[in-house]
Swiss-Prot record:
It catalyses: adenosine(1518)/adenosine(1519) in 16S rRNA + 4 S-adenosyl-L-methionine = N(6)-dimethyladenosine(1518)/N(6)-dimethyladenosine(1519) in 16S rRNA + 4 S-adenosyl-L-homocysteine + 4 H(+). Its EC number is 2.1.1.182. GO terms for molecular function: 16S rRNA (adenine(1518)-N(6)/adenine(1519)-N(6))-dimethyltransferase activity; RNA binding. The lineage of its organism: Bacteria, Bacillati, Cyanobacteriota, Cyanophyceae, Nostocales. It is found in: Cytoplasm. Pfam families: RrnaAD. SMART domains: rADc. This is Ribosomal RNA small subunit methyltransferase A. Specifically dimethylates two adjacent adenosines (A1518 and A1519) in the loop of a conserved hairpin near the 3'-end of 16S rRNA in the 30S particle. May play a critical role in biogenesis of 30S subunits. S-adenosyl-L-methionine binds at H11, L13, G38, E59, D84, N109.
Length: 271
């Protein structure tokens, strides 16, 4: 049996309840082509394989790849790629495997220390969104990060990550997963979330401007927005724009919804 390695922040999920919740949230059908990131020992993989058309798993750990190849390698709808998901060229690696090309769903228990970069690779960014979005992305991640993904404006957890992700996808909380559901147990609790990439309701005219505004706006979270953004717009002018959007001029960054951030960026674009 391969032991979890700290180098790769590995924690094996062992809870049947959590596994059931993940599989249910994925809403798999026999037409689905699944991408799994970090399959580990394959406990989730085994649940998914009978229900889907194909599953491609990307695993960085060579020892785990040997284990998975030995146990699941003969499954016709299973393909294993050894490598770092953040750097691997998925399309190029799948070029010779038509059955596994263009996965339409992601289901994964991902390493918590690289959650942000993984989500960015899956969704893209405000200025460079994924042009071939997945139908859905179901992730088991650190609870604190999960709360930021689906946070509403006005809450203490709403931040720059919330805006960047919610601009590109609908975010839904599925369930909490305690540390005891893993071996070894991590130092934090976890949660399952589902992201559904969608059409942008209010397109931003200048994506780079929006990214810059969000970065500056949340730079000093407890300060009023007109103070954080004074390097790009006069305080009095910003107060006028906020009032035009029915936003309190004394608002802080976390008080403004994703759509309001977009509207503000668009107004500044016609200055």
């Amino acid at each position: 049996m391969v032991r979890p390695r700290k180098l790769f922040a590995q924690h094996w999920l062992k809870s049947e309840k959590a596994l059931d919740a993940i599989v249910k949230a994925a809403e798999c059908s026999t037409n689905d082509r699944i991408l799994e990131i970090g399959p580990g020992t394959g406990i989730l993989t085994r649940r998914l394989l009978p229900a889907v058309q194909s599953l491609v798993a990307v695993e960085i750990d060579r020892d785990l790849c040997e284990l998975l190849a030995k146990q699941l390698g003969k499954k016709e709808n299973f393909l294993l790629l050894q490598g770092d998901f953040l750097t691997i060229d998925l399309a190029a690696n799948l070029g010779s495997f038509p059955k596994f090309q263009k996965p339409n769903k992601v289901v994964a228990n991902i390493p918590y220390n690289i959650t942000g970069p993984i989500i960015e690779k899956l969704l893209g960014t405000i200025s460079n969104p994924n042009l071939e979005p997945f139908d859905s992305i179901v992730l088991l991640i650190q609870k604190e990060v999960a709360e930021r993904l689906y946070a509403k404006s006005g809450s203490r957890t709403f931040g720059a990550l919330s805006v960047r992700v919610q601009y590109l996808a609908d975010c839904e909380f599925i369930c909490d997963v305690p540390a005891s559901a893993f071996h070894p147990p991590p130092k934090v609790d976890s949660a399952v979330v589902r992201l559904r990439p969608r059409q942008i309701e209010i397109p931003v005219n200048d994506p780079k401007r929006l990214e810059n505004l969000v970065k500056l706006g949340f730079g000093a979270k407890r300060k009023m927005l007109r103070n954080n953004l004074q390097s790009v717009v006069d305080r009095d002018r910003l107060s006028q724009l906020l009032e035009q959007l029915n936003i309190n001029p004394q608002a802080r960054a976390e008080d403004i919804s994703t759509q309001q951030w977009v509207k503000l960026a668009n107004l500044l674009g016609v200055e």
